């Protein structure tokens, strides 16, 4: 074998872990590609991009609770998808794949063991293969940039310039999801412990500059457009009100792991193995090692990811995405090859169980990409709605925002996300800023947009709530110039929702 052949084989070997992770990403993320809606957040984020499409800044005419960079990223990806929800979902798979690659590189840098590193990354992908995680949450986008920043710091610890790049990456994360600013704290603490005062000062100045520049740019842009009030409300006032709601609790965390055990016992056992072996090894450490472990960056990231979940306050599983990523760093605490081997075997069993259960369905979805969107019920409902109009028309949607996405329309309402109409803290802030009027829902309906989409009932924090106290969804009962569409065929379609909601209806009213 000549030198050229050997070099080609070596390059191929380096490529194998990434090809493996990409394959696992596709299989685990596309089990439910044929289901149109798994979570309603994504549809709302897509509609928020209409601001940018129409030449406005994020949150100028369509309000969502996330940072401006997140809305811009959604805009670019949805633009690339050209109205195809299926393509957009696949683009989110690419973001998850690169995030798993960053995790692999971080584990490999510390462990110098490809098998255990690929096992940790595979476990993360298996955890992200659950139904609730198959969406483009802001946490995933932010995690992409946080993990990139940590990888830069880990690989280029002795280059002050790279701390500037890491700061830029961290800044982007906070401009995606405001709460991720909490992950800057463990980096500051860790760097303080690892460096003398001079080096610490230089690195923090470089990183701080990188963090500040993107924020200053957005502050200037929003100030020039007289939108600083809504910018600060979205970044500070409303998130702090959100935190004070205090809905999260330890019990819901145990429910999450119980459900995980029911879905894939070996994935659950992998997490238990990580935690139990790490705690056992940690308990036998000396005082000096205990002190070092306390200030270790990777341990602190796990701790702060738990804080993020509880600060999030609403028991939403997607607030656990950071924990599911950072908990893989417990692999650094394994003391011997037997522990690493046992963990890798358990992850392998979890992977095999997942493939046996889901691979055929995922591959079937991936082989039928051109047909899937045509089977989406809300997509077909949007075509029916559009058939009633020749020119432009306005749509007021209190639910089923995907219809707006398919129609390429902005919402007639300033608030986009359906549940935010019923969050008192949000409504109060937006009213104080003059973004909403008193009884704004009634006034929106009274202004008689061409299409009104609503739902008379909604599950709010686990409880079914009749919405007639806020407004009467049966618009055609009191506005005789509206006709109600028969949407039963769309409502009972098996591809509509992953989570069946017996209380929901699809009420669509067309102005005659």
List PLM regions with ranges:
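Transmembrane-helix signature of polytopic, membrane-embedded enzymes
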Residues: 103-126, 143-144, 296
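Short periplasmic/luminal acceptor-recognition loop of GT-C membrane glycosyltransferases, typified by
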Residues: 371-430, 440-463
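Membrane-interface transmembrane helices that cradle and orient dolichyl/undecaprenyl
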Residues: 109-111, 147-165, 173, 197-198, ...
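Short acidic/glycine- and proline-prone juxtamembrane loop motifs at membrane-interface regions
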Residues: 131-141, 316-317
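Perimembrane helix-loop-helix junctions
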Residues: 183-212, 329
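Membrane-interface alpha helices of multi-pass inner-membrane proteins
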Residues: 162-178, 184-189, 213, 302-311
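Transmembrane-helix motifs of polytopic, lipid-linked glycan transferases
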Residues: 90-111, 119, 148, 280-281
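Hydrophobic/aromatic-rich transmembrane helices and adjacent perimembrane loops
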Residues: 306-342
